[in-house]
A protein has these predicted regions:
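Catalytic adenosine-cofactor/nucleotide-binding cores of aminoacyl-tRNA synthetases and other
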Residues: 8-96, 194-213, 217-233
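Short hydrophobic "helix-edge" motifs at membrane interfaces and signal-peptide entry regions
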Residues: 25-26, 110-113, 170-172
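Basic, alpha-helical terminal appendages of large translation-related enzymes
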Residues: 53, 117, 122-123, 132-238
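Conserved, charged catalytic cores of large soluble enzymes
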Residues: 76-115, 135, 139-154
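Secondary-structure capping and boundary motifs in well-ordered enzyme cores
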Residues: 19, 30-31, 60-71, 96-107, ...
Length: 238
């Protein structure tokens, strides 16, 4: 072979797993406890490829809740809920302003450039970090624009803000598919993105939004993407 990948050790609370220590964990059990996507995200986010890495139930729950549930999942939930409730699910023609264009650029740079470039280098944790910073930027934009307040003071501006968030969610979901394929696929379905329009090449299609609204697509009230994880009883007892 021209290239051989060397994986580091996966440590259980900082210790190598062995039968003599009685700390060997079945990965299938972890997947059942936390979900495959959350487990994949933790391992790729937390551990630099090729290096040793440590895991614990507490670490998985903390990372998944902080970044998937509270940040990415909450962003999707708030955005789609407000569109369904305040716009009756109808998106309409998009006319972005300065702050909106700035967020679009931030997310596009992360999802279309930084993330795939780092994955090409096998720097998975670095790529996910770039993606996560884009998620944080989106949540900061929500807090600054306060669409719930704009509903009373400037409904048209509220619409633009929600449209912007809808658009960036599509890039975020497409980009993170290699890490959390099930959940990102579910989000793309809620966004009305066809299964044959979810590749990295599709992100560059600037006409997708206009084509979507031309179909009369309406955003439905969303189902939670990442319910908060709880500590398994077995882990709490150990």
């Amino acid at each position: 072979p021209k290239q051989v990948y060397g994986h580091g050790f996966l440590l259980n609370r900082g210790q190598k797993e062995s039968k003599s220590l009685g700390n060997v964990t079945d990965p299938n059990v972890l997947a059942e406890q936390f979900g495959v996507d959350a487990l994949r995200y933790f391992l790729m986010r937390e551990i630099a490829f090729g290096q040793d890495g440590s895991y614990s139930a507490e670490a998985i729950v903390t990372r998944a809740n902080a970044e998937l549930a509270n940040s990415f999942g909450n962003l999707a939930q708030r955005t789609l809920s407000m569109i369904a409730k305040n716009l009756d699910g109808v998106l309409g023609e998009y006319r972005p302003e300065g702050d909106d264009k700035a967020l679009l650029t931030t997310v596009q740079d992360a999802c279309r450039e930084a993330f795939p470039e780092q994955f090409e280098k096998l720097a998975f944790s670095v790529g996910i970090d770039a993606w996560m910073k884009a998620v944080y930027a989106c949540n900061q934009y929500v807090d600054e624009q306060a669409p719930w307040a704009l509903k009373k003071t400037d409904p048209e501006r509220m619409r633009t803000v929600l449209q912007t968030l809808f658009i960036v969610l599509r890039d975020l979901a497409i980009a993170i598919q290699p890490v959390i394929p099930e959940k990102s696929g579910h989000l793309l379905t809620m966004l009305g993105i066809a299964e044959d329009a979810r590749t990295y090449e599709d992100m560059a299609d600037e006409g997708w939004y206009g084509a979507l609204i031309a179909t009369g697509y309406r955003v439905e009230p969303p189902t939670p993407l990442f319910p908060r994880l709880e500590m398994p009883e077995t882990a709490e007892a150990s």
